[in-house]
């Protein structure tokens, strides 16, 4: 988030080893270089019913999109998913960004909603959407059938699962002409937009089979039905060996040599 009045940019770093471990060593006043910006602002339409589907760190992005959608007269139904109960943060901001929230957690006992009209669910996010759409969670303050737009942000596997579920177990609860996009988390490198092609993402037309390529750094919001998630998974794994070596080397330096 950005506070223009104070000139502050707020960031959230996920502790996964390697460079994230270096972030733990930062002290107030240390210089930090941010590269970018990449991507394109998410398109927000007026007076729609919008379904936000967030997994893990994706929720750090979605609450700003939800706030913008509500400001444009949209109804916002938010499925916020987490692996563990300790992973949840920015609860007040998420609540302010949605009319109705389904808090999903893989870990029991899950979350207890603090607002009337919100729900808690133990299980994955697709299961939560099915439970909500079927009425298993109770009356729907916002009907899933009214959804004009679905915006999914999270891991590549979560977005792929949502994309597939729309045509299978979620199909009875969605109208045919809804529009679904995902914020594609392609690997980045140059941060200069359409230069290095590290973020190149294959698309496959479901009707013709034609394959095209786009730069995710130019526009991260891509139609779920077009994205080749197998290709994305391969791209995300391409630096796996180097990333593991870097993580072990930094861990060795920080914990064993210090």
PLM segments and residue spans:
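FAD-binding FR-type
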Residues: 1-51
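Cofactor-binding loop segments of dinucleotide-utilizing enzymes, especially the Rossmann-like FAD-
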Residues: 14-16, 37, 55, 81-83, ...
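Short amphipathic alpha-helical segments
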Residues: 24, 47, 64-66, 91, ...
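Short, glycine-rich nucleotide/cofactor-binding loops
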Residues: 49-59
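Structural beta-sheet core signal
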Residues: 51-52, 77-80, 103, 152
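Histidine-anchored nucleotide/phosphate-binding helix
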Residues: 59-70
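Conserved S-adenosyl-L-methionine
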Residues: 69-76, 99
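Reductase modules of NAD(P)H-dependent flavoproteins
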Residues: 86-258
